[in-house]
Amino acid sequence: MSQIPRNLDYLHRRRIVYRRDPLDPPDIDTPHYMFYENGTYQAYDLFKGNAKINTYKSLKWHLLVLWYLNPKLDPDDFNGLAEFIVDKSNGFTTFSISKTSLERIIHDVYMSDLDRPPTNRLRKVVFKMGSGLDKHEKLSIVGRLIGRSKRIHSDDIYQCMIDMNDMGKKITIR
């Protein structure tokens, strides 16, 4: 993985929005986090971790989110932002991209519907910026709120077997 630090100062100086808390009202709101019982797709927090953009698809998604979060951004400024992000020496990507490929991606971003937010993963716990919690404390909170409800228990398997039997399906072990 590339060890070049990200040049976030460029985004800050140009007042580019690259993170936004969800607009949905949370079920639980504390000074440290927001909890959504059914989850939210509206939490955008680009460039938070150490991971870099390493595919064209990821680059296109990042540019789409930046375009969505900055609707008043001039197209020329957006082109400059895209060129800055794809410059490997600025620490955002792990690969170089040709000018024509970048122009094609930018064109696709321009043609996208901004009335629909970009696809995002479902998040149930969103930690507030500057919460002061370290990674271990955050994991503890998530474990306490969500728990291990996604694990399969023997009762679940037994109920599934009963349901399959009621439907007349053959039950096999593989």
Where are the regions that the model predicts?
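Modules that initiate DNA replication and primer synthesis
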Residues: 2-165
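Flexible coil/turn residues that form the inter-helical turn or adjacent wing/linker of helix-turn-helix
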Residues: 167-169
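Helix-turn-helix DNA-binding elements, focusing on the entry/boundary residues of the two helices
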Residues: 173-174
